[in-house]
A protein has these predicted regions:
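A generic structural motif
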Residues: 31-37, 135-136
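Short, flexible coil/linker segments at domain boundaries that flank nucleotide/cofactor-interacting
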Residues: 1-2, 102
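N-terminal beta1-alpha1 ligand-phosphate binding loop
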Residues: 2-32
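N-terminal beta-loop-helix "entrance" segment that forms/cooperates
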Residues: 40-57, 152-153
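Glycine-rich phosphate/pyrophosphate-binding loop and the adjoining helix
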Residues: 2, 7, 136-186
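Helix-loop-strand module that forms the ligand-binding subsite of alpha/beta enzymes
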Residues: 55-134
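Cofactor-binding loop segments of dinucleotide-utilizing enzymes, especially the Rossmann-like FAD-
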Residues: 11, 41, 112
Length: 186
């Protein structure tokens, strides 16, 4: 089985983030199928004046990492029923034309929240944003970790049902990337 290179983003900057802990658990679960690198989304706020004549170096480096990856994994909380600002800012930087690294990129979205809906509303908005940028977001297979305070701690995800679901979805994501690599002209 071919191992794919993924860039992974945590939509939270919080040190004790449930989603960053979840992301580390996903990296361990998928290490037989993926080489994952967590990329920082601590980028300057998007300001078109900053790209005249060139984008900031930190943004260029971030975009290059995403461009070179076989896929993009996003693990995020939900803020105010939507996408955290820091994550939306990173996606906005990636979306700039010409040469967006998002077009055609296979994307998998995961999220954890203390509430009963997980990150359902955020993921709907992310799917809309990614569709606008012509990504190949994994259909179905939503992973909403609800009541995350009971399922994730400083050691990561410990809920067996969620672990099985994520492991199954990682296999489906691997197949999704394989499909797009075989059926997309570069």
């Amino acid at each position: 089985m071919e191992k794919y290179k993924l860039i992974a983003l945590s939509g939270s900057l919080r040190k004790a983030s449930y989603n960053t802990a979840l992301l580390h658990s996903i990296i361990q679960l998928g290490e037989d199928r993926f080489d994952m690198e967590i990329a920082s989304i601590e980028l300057p706020l998007l300001n078109i004046d900053l790209i005249d004549p060139d984008e900031p170096e930190v943004v260029l480096s971030f975009k290059q990492k995403v461009r070179e990856a076989d896929g993009l994994l996003v693990v995020t909380p939900e803020y105010n029923h939507s996408i955290p600002g820091v994550l939306k800012n990173a996606i906005d930087w990636l979306s700039l034309e010409p040469g967006t690294p998002l077009r055609g990129k296979p994307v998998m979205i995961v999220g954890a929240s203390p509430g009963i809906l997980g990150t359902a509303r955020c993921q709907i908005h992310l799917r809309q944003v990614f569709a606008t940028n012509r990504t190949n977001t994994l259909p179905g297979n939503e992973i909403f970790i609800t009541h995350c305070k009971d399922k994730i701690d400083e050691n990561g995800l410990h809920d067996e049902r969620s672990i099985r679901h994520i492991d199954k979805t990682l296999s489906e994501y691997h197949d999704w990337i394989t499909f797009w690599k075989r059926n997309t002209k570069n």
